[in-house]
Amino acid sequence: MATGEALLQLPFTVNKGEVAIMLEFVQQLVNGLSLGAIYALIALGYTMVYGIIMLINFAHGDIMMVGAFVGFYSITLLGTNIVMAMIFAMIACAVLGVVIEKVAYRPLRGSTRIAALITAIGMSLFLEYMTIFLLGPQQKVFPHSAFPLKEYNAMGLLITNKDIFIIVSAVVLMIILQYIIKMTKTGKAMRAVSVDREAAVLMGISVDKTISITFAIGSALAAAAGVMVGVYYNTINPLMGIIPGLKAFVAAVLGGIGIVPGAMVGGFVMGILETFVSGYGSSLYRDAVAFGVLILILLIKPTGLFGKDTGEKV
Amino acid sequence: MLQVKEIDVYYGAIHALKKLSLEVEQGKIVTLIGANGAGKTTTLKTISGLLRPVSGTITYKGVDLTKVLPEKIVALGISQVPEGRRVFAPMTVMENLEMGAYLRKDKKEVQQDMELVFERFPRLKERRRQLAGTLSGGEQQMLAIGRALMARPELMLMDEPSMGLAPLLVREIFQIIKDINSRGTTILLVEQNAHMALSIAHKAYVVETGAIVLEGSPEQLMKSEEVKKAYLGG
């Protein structure tokens, strides 16, 4: 259940005035930003992996789930704070992502895309049910002690420290990502490989290493999102990656799959849309609307908001 | 410097190169001419490791290139200007040049080399922050050449650098190739424009359906009736 709904009980009496309507609107926007930041972080991994090996990594949402569990155990067993939990989760999932690519996807690199896609779905199910096998199917409550809830009332707007934590850490991670992609040699190599793998090899760039790095970064971002989901919804479970994973996939397609800024914008749009649908319509419709967006974008502009209509690259 | 000996290369079921042999001597411009589909690009791709021969050897300074990973071949001093330029379109001119120097650790000298490329190609300097995809064909070719130079190659493989360019530009590009060679870089040049290629080469090979059918000095080949008929439009 979305916390967005709980937050709907606004701390002021709605007097049907314009101010209240405006406030409610801004409040929904704030709620949507947190959720959107989470979707954006997951969408980034989808889009980066697609950009470099043209594979929709359907196990990506489940990597997020593993990140949430690593964060959970880091807090409950090791007693770390939330930031350290996030860092541990990111490291663990970076390794996991690299291993998954090496074991499951690399051997299929020369084969058809559908073979790789089916393998990705298999990997997704493997992660979900392996986690159930190892840790049980029950949901776990993300410890409140790790993140005591504080609420701030700013000019009638209710903002929690959760929102601030999620938005700030997501923005910091996105800035770091942009720095890596734009400014570092590794990031430039990633872009070069995604544009033209053969030409990149001729520069002396190791394609295998670059793809590994891409999986590591994408999975680390998913792990951070996983910990955020734990904070945001309070509970985690082995199947928690499915729906956010799919919605982040929609976000990546909405922004233009393979386009990094597109994934960020797409994530925020999806998060805000979802809270608005829940807030003004009914939360029953929010998933339908999310996937309705996918259908619409595929019908109207399959290359996404940021995509150029160049057709398939050959 | 480079010996290609009796290589056989397949594209799936197609026998693309049939016992093809050629030799590139240090300091020279060697050209490989032939019609479309004769196997010129395949030869270059096999040397740079993108394709592997099923038999035969490729020896560069005593190293068997067929056993070296393609991304390591650059480190041995071989860089390539690929067919169709293949610049990284959504990256800037400077970023493309940086990619050419990807394996180099000497940051300062890389910077100096970039200045040298800009000296050679002032058009690129003007456009150094522009995306490579926005450049004209000629400028992209210059960028592809500049990018290959950034690796400080001893041997440069050039695949149809004149393709799709206006005659004036073609002349300019060939002048540049000659100049690069005069500064010590050995060049293996693949061309359909046989006339231009023969005018600057020291040695030439004619390839037809995957095999060398003629070789010799450019003067000899220019006189050959076969070459005249098939490639020089005479």
Language model: regions and residue ranges:
Chain A
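Cytosolic-side transmembrane-helix boundaries in multi-pass membrane proteins
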Residues: T3, Q9, V14-V19, V103, ...
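Membrane-interfacial amphipathic/re-entrant helices at transmembrane-helix boundaries
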Residues: E5-I42, V70, I82-A85, S111-A116, ...
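Membrane-embedded helix boundary and interhelical linker motif in transport proteins
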Residues: V30, I52-V99, V103, L108, ...
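Helix-loop-helix "hairpin" substructures at the membrane interface of multi-pass membrane proteins
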Residues: L35, L157-I236, V260-V265
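Short, non-helical or kinked segments that cap or interrupt transmembrane helices
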Residues: A37, Y46-A68, I82, G110-A115, ...
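Transmembrane alpha-helical segments in multi-pass inner-membrane proteins
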Residues: Y39, G79-I91, F215-A222, G226-G292
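Alpha-helical transmembrane segments within multi-pass membrane transporters and channels
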Residues: G79-M123, M130, V265-M270, K301-P302
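Transmembrane helix-bundle core of multi-pass membrane transporters
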Residues: P107-L108, T112-M183, T210, F276, ...
